[in-house]
Amino acid sequence: IVSRSPVPDETINEHAWLVDDKAGGLSPIRDRTDGQARILHAVISCKWTLRSDRAQNARSEALNLVRNRKGRTPHIMVVTGEPTPSRISSLALGTGDLDCVYHFALPELRAAVNAHGNADSNELLDMMIEGQRLRDIADLPLDLTV
């Protein structure tokens, strides 16, 4: 789970006057020092491999968070080391419950599939990457800045 704290008005108004006592008073990003909870920014599910039951767990975890949230929908992501593109696609090309699937060794997976995989595996892997449904783990911190 990745969360963030609410921000004081001084920080929000640092570069331009955006909020005061009359504007934006209900936004959860504003620190009102009344013991408000942290803001849920992202949920990252880590699955070493993706058998069908594990893939379904990641999807149902995401749906439960979305249904029970208050406020905006957090980023919902999966990190995996799954070596087969077909299993990765069960999540990456799913119903849109997840923002993205991240592979901890995507360059190595691409090289292995290019060297030893069949044409269908290569095409599936390329489709997930070009469609921005599968990314390398190095992209994850950058994607979390948004």
What does each model-found stretch correspond to?
Residues 68-146:
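C-terminal tail/extension regions appended to the core domain(s) of diverse proteins
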Residues 1-2, 40-46, 58:
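Conserved catalytic cores of phosphodiester-cleaving nucleases, focusing on short active-site segments
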Residues 2-5, 105-107:
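Short loop/turn segments at strand-loop or loop-helix junctions that form parts
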Residues 5, 48-49, 81:
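Histidine- and/or cysteine-centered catalytic micro-motif in compact active-site loops
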Residues 9-15, 49-61, 72, 86-89:
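Active-site-adjacent loop/helix micro-motif of nuclease/hydrolase catalytic cores
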Residues 63-66:
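A short, acidic, amphipathic alpha-helical segment used as a generic capping/interface helix at domain edges
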Residues 39-43, 70-73:
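Short, surface-exposed connector motifs at secondary-structure boundaries
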Residues 3-4, 12-38:
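Active-site-proximal segments of catalytic enzyme domains
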